[in-house]
A protein has these predicted regions:
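Membrane-embedded alpha-helical bundles of multi-pass transporters/translocases
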Residues: 1-310
């Protein structure tokens, strides 16, 4: 049974380091994505497809990854191997995704980026689904799990504090001749560092999924049996009323957040400053960074305190 004693602070920090990678990838991706329109001349339609298609695949692979992880039996447990593999795939594919050349045609860059983006989000699925499940298995105590997630979210939120400062590097001619060149170079650092951070929970965190795994291992099950079992699990999960409420809340919160995050740069630069990036200055950076600092020092402590009390 999962341990009821408090999770050691070192384990909470190790888990939180993984959350930093889990948040840093999309935080930097949201900043770099502007380059596809600004620096490489992609149309809004192509830009929308680059957002839509990988996330559509992500929506399909997420529950599938959960099923695979739950049914895995290994000496390393049923979460850590996938966290390890997903971290490597995500880091390497993030680097490859941004090796774009403005001299290539727009459609060449579109298909190149789309292909690597799909691989990246599959890697993120392999990493993030077992990673989050690992966190909930580190303790059976509700309040201890809440404290773990508060620590992890606090550490992870710093991704949104730090990432906006890449705006300044990307558009400073003293650093890079163009934003596209800046993305090619900075992706090496972001992908490499985030890959290392994502490997930390796979190596140092100890969930209670069992040393040899506690997945339901069915040697003689056919593909049809497996698909039926998977479908039955989806139906049972979706019929759960509390889960439905969580899904609805998550849908609206994430859509609101992602919409603002994706369009904030365009609003600040084009609506408020007439398309002049020099005039916009550090405002795109400050907008994202200050909001995230408020989340770190106001929202997360308050929500964690309320969860402990109520």
């Amino acid at each position: 049974a999962p341990a009821k004693e408090p999770i050691p602070l070192s384990q909470k920090i190790a888990f939180g380091v993984g959350m930093l990678a889990n948040q840093m990838f999309p935080a930097v991706l949201g900043i770099f994505m502007v380059i596809l329109v600004e620096g490489l001349g992609m149309s809004p339609l192509l830009w929308s497809l680059i957002f839509f298609i990988p996330k559509l695949i992500d929506a399909i692979t997420d529950p599938l990854m959960g099923y695979i992880s739950d049914h895995t039996v290994s000496r390393w447990g049923k979460r850590r191997p996938y966290v390890f593999i997903g971290a490597i795939i995500s880091g390497l594919s993030f680097v490859m995704m941004w090796q774009l050349d403005p001299n290539n045609s727009i459609m060449h860059n579109f298909y190149y980026f789309l292909a690597w983006s799909c691989i990246f989000w599959i890697g993120m699925t392999i990493f993030s689904v077992p990673y989050v499940a690992m966190g909930y298995e580190m303790s059976s105590d509700f309040h201890e799990r809440t404290r773990l997630m508060a620590v992890a979210q606090w550490i992870g939120q710093w991704a949104w504090v730090l990432a906006p400062w890449l705006w300044i590097l990307l558009y400073d001619p003293n650093w890079f001749e163009s934003a596209a060149e800046g993305a090619r170079f900075l992706s090496l650092w972001v992908g490499g560092i985030c890959m290392v951070l994502a490997l930390v929970p796979a190596i140092f965190c100890h969930s209670n999924s069992g040393a040899v795994g506690e997945g339901v291992h069915q040697d003689n099950s056919s593909l049809a049996d497996t698909l039926r079992d998977f479908g039955r699990g989806i139906v049972i999960t979706l019929s759960n009323k509390p889960f439905q409420k969580i899904c609805i809340a998550t849908f609206f919160i994430f859509n609101a957040f992602q919409t603002i995050a994706a369009f904030s740069w365009f609003i600040i630069v084009y609506y408020m400053n007439g398309g002049d990036t020099a005039q916009a200055g550090a405002w795109p950076t400050l907008f994202g960074s200050v909001m995230s600092l408020c989340t770190c020092f106001l929202v997360i402590p308050v929500v964690n305190g309320m969860a402990q009390r109520y």
